[in-house]
Amino acid sequence: MAYLILGLVLFLGVHSVRIVADDWRGRTITRIGAMPWKGAYAIVSLLGLVLIVWGFSQARMTPTQIWSPPMGMRHLAWLLTWLAFVLLAAAYVPGNAIKARLHHPMVLGVKSWALAHLLANGNLAHMLLFGSFLLWAAFNFSAARRRDRAGVRLHRHRPQP
């Protein structure tokens, strides 16, 4: 379980920089450049993802059952996962109505995906993994909407000359 937790801290931590330290992120990108930032971000993300996969696979070998989901939850999970895939695809299709209406369909897709898995799985490893992603996505969506209202453009950091 320790590897799962460490992986979540690394992966979600680096993905939370924009949420908790956006100004620091901007200054760091200006100081070191976009490519070194993206390289470090990718390395930490990849290490976190590897630890999540490894830790989750280890935790599943000795599951700690917290609750037993009702049979109908699997059907609801399927529907929410389908919605998550639609939202994920909408994030990459330029100029579509879903993105125009929801503004951050990828984060909403992560929320839907995580909720689906929480509803359908009641063991500790699932709850830790998908609960963490659901909380991260909720905070991320809130921060992104605040940036939207403030007029901050996403993914477009260009240092001023």
Give residue spans per PLM region.
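Membrane-anchoring alpha-helices and their flanking helix-loop junctions
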Residues: 1-103, 108-161
